[in-house]
Amino acid sequence: MVTPKQIDFSSCVGADNSNGTLSHRRSPRNIPSSKRAASVAEEETMKKKMKMKKKKKKLDPPLIVRIWNEEDELSILKGLVDYRAKTGFNPKIDWDAFCSFLGSSIVERFSKDQVLSKIRKLKRRFHVHSEKINQGNDPKFTRSSDSEAFGFSSMIWGQGDDDGMDKEHEVNGNGAAENRTNESGEEMLKEHEEEVANTELLNENGAAKTTENGTSSGKERHDEDNDDDDELCAVQDAFEAVMSQGLSGYQKKLQLEKLMNLGNGKRRELSDEWKALCVEETRFNIKKLRFSAKLAEAANDS
């Protein structure tokens, strides 16, 4: 009788292990080790993401930044003029009622304290400009809206009315609040001089060169250059305000070049005369605005 031939599979699939299972099967111990590796990698990734988020939060700027612009300042000044006309020009202002009167364009973006702080700054700025004008100096408006803002301010504080703001925000009785006001006014007066405060011609050792009489030659030269630039700007401003209308581009260029090449004496004469006219015009506009305020007050009283 033929017995079946036993086939040996060991040559094809390898030898059996001690448990009788095929050697090509994976050990169950390999599965948890791979899961642990994946888990560790995932934890490292999460830690990196958390660190990045924390770092980003530190670097991110504040979400809400309150910035006043020219339109906001004019809105407040116009609002004060209208509110005073509505309340019969009462010198004592109810600031809570005024903030409600301003409307959502300001109130929704700024708090009452921010509004009052801005009004105090506008009031100080007006008094600084008024003092310079009364002394016969140019107020030097740096923005296009400064002249308009000064007009509204003169209607509010030009008569010297006490709006109660300074007393309401006094800090103590030793004059601390008053000192801050004076310091702020002095800072405004000096803000146009700070840019040229320390510009002197230096020698090789880093010291300012001095002349025989002990004065700084660099400072004198710098002052002369500033005077020349100021005179040129004044003459150019006068030309654009008085003569340039109706001229072609070429005519403007030709005549302006001639004015820029004038001698120092003639140029200084024209510059001084134009500055004097500007001061007179500013004073006239102030008087006109004050008269407008009186006229509006009389119309509301009758």
Curated annotation (Swiss-Prot):
Residues 270-291 are annotated as: Non-canonical leucine-zipper. It comes from the Eukaryota. The keyword rRNA processing does not apply. Residues 208-217 have a biased composition (Polar residues). Residues 180-195 have a biased composition (Basic and acidic residues). Disruption phenotype: No visible phenotype. One of its GO terms (molecular function) is transcription cis-regulatory region binding. Residues 1-55, 158-229 are annotated as: Disordered. GO terms for biological process: defense response to oomycetes; regulation of DNA-templated transcription. InterPro entries: GEBP, GeBP-like_DBD. Belongs to the GeBP family. Overexpression of GEBP results in a reduced plant growth, a delay in flowering, a reduced anthocyanin accumulation, a delayed senescence and an enhanced resistance toward a virulent strain of the biotrophic oomycete pathogen H.arabidopsidis. Homo- and heterodimers. Interacts with GPL1, GPL2 and GPL3. Interacts with KIN10, KIN11 and FLZ4. Interacts with KIN10 and KIN11 via its N-terminal part. Interacts with GPL1 and GPL3 via its C-terminal part. DNA-binding protein, which specifically recognizes the GL1 enhancer sequence. May be involved in leaf initiation. May play redundant roles with GPL1 and GPL2 in cytokinin responses by regulating the transcript levels of type-A ARR response genes. Involved in stress responses. Plays a repressive role in cell expansion by counteracting the positive role of CPR5 in this process, but does not regulate cell proliferation or endoreduplication. May play a role in plant defense. PANTHER family: BNAANNG10740D PROTEIN-RELATED, GLABROUS1 ENHANCER-BINDING PROTEIN-RELATED. This is GLABROUS1 enhancer-binding protein. It comes from Arabidopsis thaliana (Mouse-ear cress).
